[in-house]
């Protein structure tokens, strides 16, 4: 049976106490969570030799999670991704959100969900689960409505990490939640993933961006482009520096429209760390996965977990979510959450070994 331990972490700059929630399963694999940002701090799973590897990037101290702009492992919202110029119109009313990424609103603004200490609920009878809860007030970063948000993490004996997001608001609002974990399946300290990780994405289409990193509104076939990961290939083989889209983002920072079926969960992506043999399958109820190749990561040893140094392309993100800036593109599936209706999405990260 799984074991759950709760240990003190470090206080935030505001003096708020934070904690680490460590779920360890029968095989010795574990997931560590933090109530600041309802974040994933570590995922430790066995490699092909039976050694345990931590396969997500993270910070050594709380100030990294509180202030750095990489969002390591964080729950981001109310709306992940970019909203162009922080502007949208809802029910005939114009809204101006905080602008925290050039001229755009990114991942919910300055004081987004990753910057907040969530209330954690644990139950001794369910030792493989942690529930985080947050109240986001009306006007939070410019969003309408008082919103209650819940994130439930479960880690089982099969090395499956399940994340379930739910939310409800008393006014119509925007809601698009994701987890921003950075994966390096060879181990978080093992350097670039471009030449030693294979990636397959279950998507025949992707969403192009403009030079401001906002969606153009098009949905484009991946065939004959750098973005064709319909068969497994090295991540680096998809980063064609001559491609204009890659140039805009300094790598891959794009939304892929998943090939959906009638199943509740669709396979979004599969990855393998070639050196470790650790594999990852990502299933989701969402319509897309945003793939980011850590294009602007620059974390010095005094900040990285276990004194790690993280640089460009040192990980990849599989951010399951609705389409970015959907509120400004009528052809995209909506991210509007109606008053008193329930938002619910689920993603499963399944870790295995290719021996």
How would you label these PLM feature ranges?
Residues 2-355:
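An exposed, glycine/acidic-rich loop-and-rim segment of catalytic or binding clefts
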């Amino acid at each position: 049976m799984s074991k759950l331990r709760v240990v003190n972490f470090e206080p935030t700059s505001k003096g708020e106490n934070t904690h680490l929630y460590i779920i360890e399963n029968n095989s010795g694999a574990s997931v560590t969570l933090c109530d600041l940002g309802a974040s994933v701090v570590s995922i430790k799973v066995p490699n092909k030799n039976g050694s345990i590897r931590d396969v997500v990037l993270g910070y050594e101290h709380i100030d990294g999670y509180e202030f750095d702009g990489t969002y390591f492992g964080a729950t981001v919202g109310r709306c992940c991704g970019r909203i162009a110029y922080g502007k949208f119109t809802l029910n005939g009313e114009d809204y101006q959100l905080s602008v925290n990424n050039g001229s755009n609103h990114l991942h919910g603004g300055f004081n987004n969900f990753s910057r907040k200490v969530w209330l954690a609920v644990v139950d001794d009878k369910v030792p493989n689960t942690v529930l985080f809860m947050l109240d986001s007030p009306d006007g939070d970063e410019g969003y309408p409505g008082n919103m209650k948000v819940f994130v439930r993490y479960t880690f089982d004996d099969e090395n499956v990490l399940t994340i379930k997001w739910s939310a409800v608001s008393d006014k119509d609002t925007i809601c698009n939640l994701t987890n921003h974990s950075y994966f390096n399946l060879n181990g978080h300290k093992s350097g670039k993933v471009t030449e030693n990780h294979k990636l397959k994405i279950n998507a025949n289409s992707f969403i192009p961006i403009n030079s401001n990193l906002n969606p153009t509104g098009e949905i484009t076939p991946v065939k004959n482009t750098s973005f064709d990961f319909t068969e497994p290939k090295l991540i680096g083989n998809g980063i064609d520096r001559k491609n204009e889209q890659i140039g805009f983002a300094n790598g891959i920072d794009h939304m892929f429209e998943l090939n959906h079926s009638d199943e509740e969960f669709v396979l979004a992506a599969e990855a393998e760390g070639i050196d470790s043999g650790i594999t990852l399958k990502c299933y989701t109820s969402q319509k897309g996965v945003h793939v980011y190749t850590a294009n602007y990561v620059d974390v010095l040893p005094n900040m990285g977990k276990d004194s790690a140094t993280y640089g460009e392309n040192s990980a990849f993100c599989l951010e399951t979510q609705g389409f970015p800036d959907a509120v400004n593109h009528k052809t995209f599936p909506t991210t509007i959450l109606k008053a008193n209706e329930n938002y619910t999405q689920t993603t499963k990260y399944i870790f295995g070994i290719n021996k």
